[in-house]
Amino acid sequence: MSEVAFQDCYPDELSHCYGCGKNNTAGHQLKSYWQSDNQNSQGLTIAHYTPEACYTAIPGFVYGGLLASLIDCHGTGSAAAVAFQQANRAMGTLPPLRFVTAALNVSYIAPTPMGAELELIGTFIEVKEKKVVVEITVSANNVICAKGTVIAVKMPDSMLNVKC
């Protein structure tokens, strides 16, 4: 696994996302990585997250909206990482390559137990210059609890406030 999270490579001006922004202390602070040390091919991505009690749906189980949020942020972070890879650029170099969610589809497979570390695995389905499709599985205790598909599109210039 790489040592620096994808989200930690985002410019400060683009790091305020509730789900993954390093500058949002009230947020989830999700951190995504390449699953293996081989970052030269479109491999798998991985993230881990342990829900706090405030994300309870009913006692003992995680709120589904949290799972959707984690899938969303792991998907867009994975899209940014593969875009940098495809451009033969180091993550964090300017101009930024950031992606936003164009579509999110989540299927809940099994109840997600509270108190377990969640593992998110991202698999690339389609990679184009301005669009990346990532499938994400969320597991707890080695049981798949949710699956999601994120269609991520390159962030429009109108949203970028970064000066190169």
Language-model-detected regions and their locations in the chain:
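Non-catalytic linker/capping segments at the edges of enzyme domains
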Residues: 1-58
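Conserved beta-strand residues within beta-sheet cores
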Residues: 27-29, 48, 101-105, 119-121, ...
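Hydrophobic residues in beta-strands and at strand termini
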Residues: 49-51, 108, 154
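Hydrophobic beta-strand-centered segment that forms part of the acyl-chain substrate-binding groove
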Residues: 77-119
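HotDog/MaoC-like acyl-thioester-processing domains
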Residues: 1-12, 110-164
